[in-house]
Swiss-Prot record:
Domain of life: Bacteria
Localization per Swiss-Prot or TrEMBL: Cytoplasm
The protein's name in its UniProt record: Probable tRNA sulfurtransferase
Keyword presence, Iron: no
GO molecular function: ATP binding; CCA tRNA nucleotidyltransferase activity; tRNA binding; tRNA-uracil-4 sulfurtransferase activity
Pathway assigned in UniProt: Cofactor biosynthesis; thiamine diphosphate biosynthesis
Homology family: Belongs to the ThiI family.
GO biological process: thiamine biosynthetic process; thiamine diphosphate biosynthetic process; thiazole biosynthetic process; tRNA 4-thiouridine biosynthesis
EC number annotated for this UniProt entry: 2.8.1.4
């Protein structure tokens, strides 16, 4: 027998009271987006659970995708069976003979939403249990924590049997906690920060700074690929490319080398905040980890943060590098992040950056530049694209890379 559907149970959504259906609807839409790579799959939700109908799709692939989607507590692959006692007895015996090993205990857990069915739940438990005893004489029943639980559901359309329960990602459905703008550099830390924000239900838009010709099409594709990895946890993500060449050249020309990083980060924060406001996001999210590099001391963070009043969420701020790498490997972003492409934070990185920048000095250097004009031109030049779980056969960045080669 092949699985016909996967039943989904919600996680924290059960505690959301009157708002539960809003959370459930968001989870349903997220699942549809993530599973859009399987055109034969259909998704249906009722108040208590979700149903993913496979319609011939590969169960292992669909299951692997569901494991990543935030908001799912657990799910159970199920067999669709003719709604008759003989068919149910035959199916239960076949499943037990496939999975049973000597010494295992079992129980039947039947429920029916179709009350016109000829047996009630208690009688169905008895009849199906007797069928198992006949086929496997030495099997033992155990009502509490058995090795095998065969769940039988009698619905209006058919009967369904499941015996596996697979743990989901938990958390909250992406988009139920508002929207944030993720500063996505292309390194190891920022995709992990984005993942952790997604887990708490924050919809993210990924904002990436590009400085051609100093940064390459390969660096931009890397950022696209990292964003696509993050779509696995809740569906499509908007990607925002910001032109940053003019600003970096201006900073390099008019400021001391030791302050290049602080000034660069302040411009990035201003632009991110402006884009955030225009696009209706509530917070800024970044991958800063305290003490990891010169721009991530408390003094540097204070100097950089001074340009905005918007809350800045730093999900990895207290983690060390190995902890961040562990998560990056778990979510499959690490190998992409370590690809050797320069990004805006590394191309003009000073040998001895200021770790304790003075705001009055920073403001003095910024007075040499047309800060507002630079920010306005960068924001006016943004390029917005939608990144989906399904990778396009070839996008514009791929074509640029081929042309260069």
């Amino acid at each position: 027998m092949n699985y016909s559907e996967i039943m989904i149970r919600y996680g924290e959504l059960s505690t959301k009271g009157k708002n539960k259906m809003r959370f459930v609807n968001k989870l349903r839409n997220n699942i549809k987006h993530v599973l859009s790579v399987y055109p034969e799959v259909t998704v249906y939700f009722d108040r208590d659970r979700g149903h993913v109908y496979l319609n011939g799709a590969d169960y292992q692939e669909v299951s692997a995708s569901l494991k990543k989607i935030f908001g799912i507590q657990n799910f159970a692959p199920s067999y669709k069976i003719e709604k008759s006692v003989p068919a149910l007895k035959e199916a239960v015996v076949e499943i037990m003979q496939t999975i049973y090993k000597e010494g295992m205990t079992f129980k039947i857990a039947a429920r029916r939403s179709d009350h016109s069915f000829e047996l009630d739940s208690r009688d169905l438990n008895q009849v199906l249990g007797d069928a198992v005893f006949t086929a496997i004489p030495n099997v033992q029943v155990q009502m509490k924590s058995p090795d095998i639980t065969l769940r039988v559901e009698i619905r209006p359309d058919a009967a369904y049997i499941s015996h596996e329960e697979i743990k989901g990602a938990g958390g909250l459905p992406v988009g139920t906690s508002g929207k944030g703008t993720l500063m996505l550099s292309g390194g190891i830390d920022s995709p992990v920060a984005g993942y952790l924000a997604l887990k708490r239900g924050v919809e993210i838009e990924a904002l990436h700074f590009a400085s051609p010709p100093y940064t390459s099409p390969g660096a931009l594709k890397k950022a696209h690929d990292l964003t696509r990895k993050l779509t696995a946890f809740g569906g499509n993500i908007t990607f925002i490319e910001v032109p940053f060449t003019e600003i970096q050249e201006e900073i390099k020309e008019k400021a001391p080398e030791a302050y290049l990083m602080t000034l660069t980060r302040r411009f990035m924060m201003r632009i991110t905040d402006r884009v955030r406001e225009e696009r209706g996001a509530m917070v800024i999210i970044n991958g800063e980890s305290l003490g990891q590099v010169a721009s991530q001391t408390l003094e540097s963070m204070q100097a950089i943060n001074a340009v905005t009043n918007t809350p800045v969420i730093r999900p990895v701020v207290t983690m060390d590098k190995l902890e961040i790498i562990d998560i990056a490997q778990e979510i499959d972003t690490f190998d992409i992040s370590i690809q050797p492409f320069e990004d805006c934070c590394t191309i003009f990185a000073p040998d001895r950056p200021k770790t304790n920048p003075k705001i009055k000095n920073v403001e003095q250097y910024e007075a040499r530049m047309d800060v507002e004009g630079l920010v306005e031109r960068a924001v006016a030049g943004i390029i917005v694209t939608e990144i989906t779980p399904k990778e396009e056969v070839k996008d514009e960045v791929d074509s640029l890379i081929e042309d260069l080669l």
